[in-house]
Design a protein with these regions (language model features):
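Ligand-recognition surfaces built from glycine- and aromatic
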Residues: 1-25
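N-terminal beta-rich core of secreted/periplasmic extracellular enzymes
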Residues: 26-198
Length: 198
């Protein structure tokens, strides 16, 4: 009989159910759960406007990737109004620090902005693409490359990366085939594990 394991993260509206008895949850926070943390979050949410809550769900693209005239994307006004939850594909420790300082100085709610980037095959040190790495079957080298990318990107102020891409490529016309490990499910799962461990 299939076992049902329930992991309650003590958030009223989120429940995660894992049906596979062999599934292990890794990367759990070692921080203790405290009533003070619950009170802090509930108090913060009660003071936020609907607009600010929606803003925390908004992800903007960094200015460096835009062409043409300045738009509403990632404007100082959005930051000051607390409407930027995260920013994708913006780099450089100084740039990230400047944006975060502006956010903490001018926004009413003072929730730090999360910075993310597509770190698919390295950050400053560029490695072969994931599809090319998968051809090697060298899981130790793939794990080392992921670890180096994680160290470099976190040192630059990035909080999370949009990697690894673990989709199994079944159609060569798909534009993101090169970001994954190919069409083999066994190899793809082993490479995904190596990248996450890295």
């Amino acid at each position: 009989a299939e076992e049902l394991q329930q992991f309650d993260f003590d958030i009223d509206w989120i429940r995660v159910y894992v049906r596979d008895p062999h599934t292990r949850i890794v990367g759990n926070s070692k921080l203790p759960h405290t009533p003070e943390a619950d009170s802090f979050v509930k108090d913060l949410l009660s003071r936020m406007t609907v607009e600010e809550k929606i803003g925390q769900l908004s992800q903007y693209v960094g200015r460096t990737l835009l062409t043409g005239p300045e738009s509403e994307y990632l404007s100082d006004s959005l930051i000051a109004r607390g409407l930027v939850g995260s920013v994708l594909n913006i780099s450089g420790a100084k740039t990230l620090r400047d944006l975060q300082e502006k956010n903490m100085r001018y926004s009413r709610i003072k929730i730090p902005i999360l910075f993310g980037m597509d770190v698919i095959h390295g950050y400053k040190t560029i490695f072969p693409t994931p599809l090319a790495e998968s051809c090697s079957w060298d899981l130790a080298a793939i794990e080392r490359a992921a670890k180096i990318a994680a160290i470099e990107s976190s040192a630059a102020g990035l909080h999370w990366t949009f990697a690894p891409m673990v989709d199994i490529a079944r159609d060569a016309r798909w534009g993101r085939v090169v970001e994954g490990a190919g069409e083999d499910t066994y190899l793809g799962s082993e490479i995904a594990k190596a990248r996450v461990n890295g």
